[in-house]
């Protein structure tokens, strides 16, 4: 059998059904933590992971492509922590990259002071933590476990129960010490921005 045929997922096999069940358990345990990940990145990983790992029955090609997927998603998670957004002159969200001098963006800032979006130490802390959360998700993923470290599956159930609460406590501590008001790429706007947008809409309607 060629490696090309091994890249096609076998969704009807008992092993794939078991992997799907284990993955669902992992996602349930990490439900409160995956909210910290960029939505688009998480969606792409969950969509492509079963295909690229062949539901855990990997060839060399599967391992290479799965590794590339993990690397790209990891980069996306870190990169998103160094982005932010503001309300543009047309009322829509505009994104940019945070720098030492402020927010670098292609959009017209209007009256927005981009210097207040300066790079902070908290951005690096959050980037490291978000990467750790994504790494936890990858570690507990049944397809990835079967593909790269099949012997690890014996202890995976224990980690699914123990690891998410531990990471949850760490996340609460980190975000208490380093609060963030960033609403970058892949993240929903913060409550203050949502409230301001609603007030603007109400004012325009009443006018």
Swiss-Prot record:
Keyword Transmembrane: yes
Protein name per Swiss-Prot or TrEMBL: Protein DMP1
Transmembrane segments: 33-53, 64-84, 121-141, 159-179
Main location, first listed in the record: endoplasmic reticulum
Family indicated by similarity: Belongs to the plant DMP1 protein family.
Keywords from the named record: Endoplasmic reticulum, Membrane, Transmembrane, Transmembrane helix, Vacuole
Region of interest (Disordered), residue spans: 1-20
Tissue: Expressed in leaves, siliques and roots.
Organism: Arabidopsis thaliana (Mouse-ear cress)
Subcellular location, record wording: Endoplasmic reticulum membrane; Vacuole membrane
Function field: Involved in membrane remodeling including fission during breakdown of the endoplasmic reticulum (ER) and the tonoplast during leaf senescence and in membrane fusion during vacuole biogenesis in roots.
GO biological process terms held by the UniProt record: endomembrane system organization; endoplasmic reticulum membrane organization; membrane fission; membrane fusion; plant organ senescence
Lineage of the species this protein comes from: Eukaryota, Viridiplantae, Streptophyta, Embryophyta, Tracheophyta
Membrane-topology annotation of the record: Multi-pass membrane protein
One GO location term (cellular component): plant-type vacuole membrane
């Amino acid at each position: 059998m060629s490696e090309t045929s091994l890249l096609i997922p076998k969704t009807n096999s008992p092993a794939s059904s078991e992997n799907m069940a284990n993955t669902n358990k992992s996602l349930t345990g990490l439900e409160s933590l995956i909210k910290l990940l960029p939505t688009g990145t998480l969606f792409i990983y969950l969509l492509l992971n079963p295909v690229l790992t062949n539901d855990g029955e990997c060839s060399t090609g599967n391992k290479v492509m799965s590794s590339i997927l993990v690397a790209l998603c990891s980069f996306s998670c870190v990169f998103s922590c160094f982005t932010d957004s503001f309300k543009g002159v047309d009322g829509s969200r505009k994104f940019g990259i945070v720098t030492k001098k402020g927010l670098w963006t292609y959009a017209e800032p209007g009256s927005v002071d981009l210097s207040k979006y300066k790079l902070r130490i908290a951005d690096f802390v959050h980037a490291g933590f978000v990467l750790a959360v994504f790494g936890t998700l990858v570690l507990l993923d049944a397809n990835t476990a079967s593909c790269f470290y099949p012997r690890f599956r014996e202890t995976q159930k224990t980690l699914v129960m123990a690891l998410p609460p531990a990471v949850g406590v760490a996340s609460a501590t980190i975000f208490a010490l380093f609060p963030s008001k960033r609403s970058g790429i892949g993240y929903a706007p913060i409550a203050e921005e949502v409230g301001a947008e609603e007030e603007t809409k109400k004012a325009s309607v009443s006018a």
